[in-house]
Amino acid sequence: MQTPKQTNEWDYIIIGAGTAGCVLANRLASNKKLNILLIEAGYQDKSLKIKIPALQPLVFGNKKFDWCYKANPDATRDNISHIWPAGKVWGGSSSLNGMIY
């Protein structure tokens, strides 16, 4: 993708540069007449913690990469509140999967 010219007008604004957001932006960008803005709250996924599967445990719970959601306590599981990882990086949760397919 190219860096767009300075503009305050957008045809499409996509919130979240996860897998779906990036694919959508790419497809829309095939029409050179459209101004598209892709917004991501997190960082680029260039960290070795993301690139090396053995370091993947260092990503979960790390506020730089993970939104650190916590589920409501579950009565069927002794009211335990489980952590629910969600990617806060370019690539979204796909960047946190430890390259497991």
Report residues per predicted region:
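N-terminal redox-cofactor-binding region of secreted/periplasmic oxidoreductases
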Residues: 1-101
